[in-house]
């Protein structure tokens, strides 16, 4: 952070330790920064350490380094805003793009100028929110996340908790828009889809699905959307089998997302290593090694490139007249055989 007596300090609710950074607030900040840069005005932005740990924080700001303070967006209200007036009393203080709840409150009267978005005290009507004219943003992938924490029938082979923890930690570092989705339908909970058509409509609008569920895989492909799949069962189970049946290659084994702990001097993968659930890893301890994410990264890139066409091809194949056979194709014959066995007292043993 460069200092200069004529610098401007830019603040907002995104600056407070116990504030919050909304997308609208940060876009409003981008609009203000665009204007300041265009005018050649030097400035620094204060961030909450809880949101941007590597940014400039109030704890390290020298008030004497600034002659002006801007407060951007949100309601001008409360003790946190009032504290700005006390700490930066020597600065010209301006609120821009804000809402005024109580014009007589110290939080409002402490500003030298208030450029409100709701028109309060300006003698004019409401103004356009600053976020509307913020600089354009790049598009990022929209990713549906469909995970399960159940399937206890797999007993000791279950790695569902570790897989979910590893996947979500990895996803948190990806520049994408994540949507947590459920294949479970519910007629009463507005958060969940009530019909298959509703869920399929959501899936069809995604760029990618990340899942450890069989139906997360199949429904994504049915919608023509690539799926990055992790089988949560050690050694592989129904998820891996279904991926093979669909002809879908982007499957990662659970073992890749399970951390390992060193016991003694053993090398990675040797008997001296103990398998450890990802959620139990103690970070910072030298004897722990994190899960491998290289395979996830490789399939992520493939799914967002060639995988798009492959998923569309497979999805179209599901609906084709000459689609690959499924178990229902032989159902009528089995039902007929069953009826004959019931009438005649004989029947054939089910096929293995």
Annotate each PLM feature:
Residues 1-352:
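Active-site anion-handling motifs in enzyme catalytic cores
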């Amino acid at each position: 952070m460069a200092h200069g007596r004529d610098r401007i300090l830019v603040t907002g609710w995104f600056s407070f330790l116990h504030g919050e950074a909304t997308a609208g607030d940060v876009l409003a900040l981008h609009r203000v920064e665009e204007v300041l840069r265009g005018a050649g005005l030097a400035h620094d932005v204060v961030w909450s350490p809880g949101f941007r740990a590597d940014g400039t924080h109030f704890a390290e700001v020298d008030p004497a380094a600034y002659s002006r303070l801007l407060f951007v967006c949100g309601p001008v209200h409360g003790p946190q805003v009032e504290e700005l007036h006390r700490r930066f009393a020597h600065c010209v203080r301006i609120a821009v793009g804000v809402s005024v709840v109580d014009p007589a409150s110290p939080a409002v009267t402490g500003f030298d100028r208030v450029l409100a978005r709701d028109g309060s005290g300006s003698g004019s009507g409401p103004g356009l929110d600053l976020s509307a004219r913020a600089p354009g943003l790049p598009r990022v992938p929209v990713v549906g996340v469909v995970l399960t924490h159940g399937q206890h029938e797999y007993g000791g082979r279950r790695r569902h908790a570790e897989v979910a923890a590893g996947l979500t930690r990895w996803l948190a570092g990806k520049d994408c828009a994540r949507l947590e989705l459920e294949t479970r339908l519910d007629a009463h909970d507005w958060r969940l889809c009530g019909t298959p058509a509703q869920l399929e409509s959501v899936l069809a609008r995604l760029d990618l699905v990340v899942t450890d569920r069989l139906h997360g895989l199949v429904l994504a492909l049915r919608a023509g959307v690539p799926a990055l799949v992790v089988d949560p069962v050690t050694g592989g189970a129904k998820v891996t089998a279904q991926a093979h049946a669909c002809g879908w290659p982007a499957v990662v084994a659970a073992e890749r997302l399970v951390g390992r702990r060193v016991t003694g001097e053993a090398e990675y993968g040797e008997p001296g290593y103990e398998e450890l659930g990802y959620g139990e890893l103690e970070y910072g301890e030298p004897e722990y090694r994190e899960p491998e994410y290289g395979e996830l990264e490789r399939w992520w890139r493939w799914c967002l490139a060639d995988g798009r066409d492959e998923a569309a091809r497979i999805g179209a194949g599901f609906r084709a007249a000459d689609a690959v056979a499924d178990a229902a194709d032989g159902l009528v014959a089995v039902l007929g055989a069953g009826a004959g066995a019931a009438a005649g007292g004989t029947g054939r043993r089910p096929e293995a």
